[in-house]
């Protein structure tokens, strides 16, 4: 790391997160260095003056100014469903990513992360990770974690649209309707059901799944949040435990050269794979992680849900190996791809 006076200090990455492209570094120095205070994100207002600090195009430390253009922007960076950002018109160019976005008192408002641009340069639409979430990165780093862990909701939902508000007897487009719940979901455990409308987390309005996940992430794993929701016409509030995604002893396998689909990498289903590939929580089968050459030529793709081999349902690695081993000449594989059931036939 290069300091403002030109000195270089080495450091190590102690925590990182691919989803947000953010990391925590530990500098190899005993010197007490200047630091920024974190601004409470819910106090940031649209129109507020901010400064973006970075090293655009490698020209050196640069400061640009602008305002907060918007709050609660979601699904911006690489189409991330987990993204939740502050929007600014302060010029942000390649090299500014990871730089500080500060207010006029010098407090950290956010960390610059991305821009929307057709040319690759600044068009006045930049985004920053809110300081509240940055603070959780620091907390987890101090706890000894090496990768950032978000609380697991085990729930899917969708924002309330204008067309949905009237039939649901809602006064405005606010909240999100629960469309699916995992059997182990902490929301399900407190009695929240499909069709309920979640309106607040810890008293703060939410309008999308990404906003709810952000509120949960800021609260942190191991805590509780108050979830306010509408159920059967009544407003209720329940305390929900914030937990990690269940980590069962799941099995996976890369098929060997003696089997008919060498290099095919399949795994039993987990909540992580269901979330990553957008599969319903009720899905059954094996997830394809890598096709290998032969299965790829047959038409399999990474992310396919392998459900039947030669007409036999498969949910475990043992069932898959047994079904594959029983194939003598002609065979078939049934997969689910983006909700479509597809049968692939082959001959040995």
Model-derived regions: residue spans:
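Active-site loop architecture of trypsin-fold serine endopeptidases
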Residues: 33, 53-66, 72-98, 103-141, ...
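C-terminal recognition in membrane/secretory proteostasis and scaffolding
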Residues: 8-13, 26-27, 45-48, 108, ...
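Active-site substrate-binding loop(s) of clan PA
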Residues: 2, 12-14, 31-59, 93, ...
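A generic structural motif
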Residues: 21-27, 88
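Short, acidic, Ser/Thr-enriched surface-loop or helix-capping motifs
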Residues: 3, 8, 63, 103, ...
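Gly/Ser-rich catalytic serine loop of serine hydrolases
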Residues: 36-39, 86-102, 181-187, 291-298
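Beta-strand-rich soluble domains of envelope-associated proteins
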Residues: 1-4, 15-19, 53-57, 73-74, ...
